[in-house]
Design a protein with these regions (language model features):
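Transmembrane beta-barrel architecture of outer-membrane proteins
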Residues: 1, 20, 56, 66, ...
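Periplasmic N-terminal accessory/gating domains of Gram-negative outer-membrane beta-barrel systems
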Residues: 1-76, 87-93
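Short sequence motifs at beta-strands and strand-loop junctions characteristic
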Residues: 16-17, 63, 80, 105-107, ...
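Strand-connecting loop/turn motifs
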Residues: 32, 64, 97-99, 110, ...
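Predominantly transmembrane beta-strands of Gram-negative outer membrane beta-barrel pores used
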Residues: 34, 68-79, 85-93, 100-144, ...
Length: 297
C-alpha cells in the first residue's frame, strides 16, 4: 500500500483510526491531498473511502503496475493545482511491446489477474483486476459486517511516431458492505443497531496526448471522475418495508477536466505553462428519520 509507505516520510503522520491509511501532511487535512496517475487526476485511490477524506483500508491501485512515485509535501509543480498538503504522483509501467504476459495471484483477502502486452506494432497495454473474498473471511470470524470490493485498472499507449503518443487510462473500484444479521451477542447487536449498508463506486477515465518537439513537450489531457456513495439503514435491519427506513443517503461527485500544458527546457531550467478547465457537479440526497428507543425496567 503506497499510502502506508509514504507515512514514514518526514512531516507525514497517520490517522488515529488504525485500519485507515489517511495521509495527514504537516498538520493538514486528509482532504487536502491530490493524486495523479500519468498526469491524470485521481480523486480517490482507496476502497471504502470517506467523502471529504483521502484514506481507506485498502488501496485501489495495484502496486505491481507502478513504475515510479513522486511525493511532494511542498513546492508543488505548477501543473498540479489544488493541493494544500501534498501531491502523490504515480507513473505506471508501459505494456510489453515484445510479448504477452499474464499473472494470476491468490492473496490473503483477494484474487487478482494482471497482464501486459501489445496490440499491433504501435500500441501496448497493461491491466489489472481484483476480486476480494473478505466477506467470507469476516463471516467465518463471526463479525457483524461483511465488506467486499472489486477493482480494475488499465493503460494503453499508442506511439504514432517518434514525436507523438496517446495514452488511455482507466481506474475503477466498487465497494459493498452488508450486515451479518445472523450474529448474536451484545457487541454484535450493538454494531448492527447503527451500521448502515454501503455501496460505493468510483471511476476515472482519461486520455493524454503528448507531442515532443525538440526542447518543447506539449500535452493535452481530458479526464472524467465519478464517485457515487449510497448508504441505507433500516430499523432492526428489516428491509421488508419502506416504513422501516431510517436513513437513505445518496451522494455523487463528478468532475470533467481539460488541461493543456507546455514544457520547455532552457538549459538547467524548465519552464511550464498551461491552462485548465474544470466542470464539477455535486449532488446530495439524504433522508433520515429519528429512531426512538424504550428502556424497560
Amino acid at each position: 500500500d503506497v499510502s502506508r509507505i509514504v507515512r514514514s516520510y518526514p512531516g507525514v503522520s497517520f490517522s488515529p483510526i488504525g485500519y485507515r491509511n489517511d495521509l495527514i501532511v504537516r498538520g493538514g487535512s486528509p482532504s487536502e491531498n491530490r493524486f495523479y496517475m500519468d498526469g491524470i487526476e485521481i480523486p480517490n485511490i482507496n476502497h471504502f473511502a470517506t467523502q471529504g477524506a483521502s484514506g481507506g483500508p485498502v488501496s485501489i491501485v495495484n502496486a505491481d503496475l507502478i513504475r515510479e512515485i513522486t511525493f511532494y509535501t511542498g513546492a508543488f509543480p505548477a501543473n498540479r493545482s489544488g493541493a494544500l498538503s501534498s501531491v502523490l504522483d504515480f507513473q505506471l509501467k508501459d505494456g510489453n511491446p515484445d510479448k504477452q504476459a499474464f499473472k494470476a495471484t491468490i492473496g490473503a483477502s483477494e484474487v487478482s489477474l494482471s497482464g501486459a502486452g501489445h496490440l499491433g506494432q504501435r500500441t501496448t497495454y497493461l491491466f489489472s483486476a481484483r476480486q476480494s473474498y473478505l466477506q467470507l473471511l469476516f463471516k467465518a470470524l463471526g463479525l457483524p459486517f461483511l465488506p467486499n470490493f472489486i477493482d480494475g485498472q488499465f493503460k494503453t499507449k499508442t506511439r504514432f511516431n517518434e514525436h507523438s503518443e496517446l495514452t488511455l487510462l482507466g481506474l475503477a473500484g466498487i465497494d459493498k458492505m452488508k450486515l451479518n444479521t445472523d450474529e448474536k451477542g451484545e457487541d454484535a447487536e450493538y454494531l448492527l443497531s447503527y451500521l448502515p449498508t454501503i455501496h460505493q463506486e468510483t471511476f476515472t477515465l482519461g486520455a493524454s496526448y503528448r507531442h515532443y518537439n525538440g526542447r518543447h513537450v506539449q500535452s493535452l489531457i481530458l479526464s472524467h471522475n465519478y464517485l457515487n456513495n449510497r448508504n441505507l439503514k433500516y430499523r432492526n435491519n428489516d428491509d421488508s418495508s419502506e416504513d422501516n427506513l431510517t436513513l437513505r443517503l445518496r451522494s455523487t461527485e463528478q468532475k470533467t477536466t481539460l488541461r493543456f500544458e507546455n514544457q520547455t527546457r532552457l538549459g538547467a531550467w524548465t519552464l511550464k505553462e498551461g491552462a485548465e478547465l474544470n466542470n464539477s457537479i455535486y449532488t446530495n440526497h439524504s433522508r433520515q428519520r429519528p429512531v426512538s428507543y424504550t428502556h424497560l425496567r
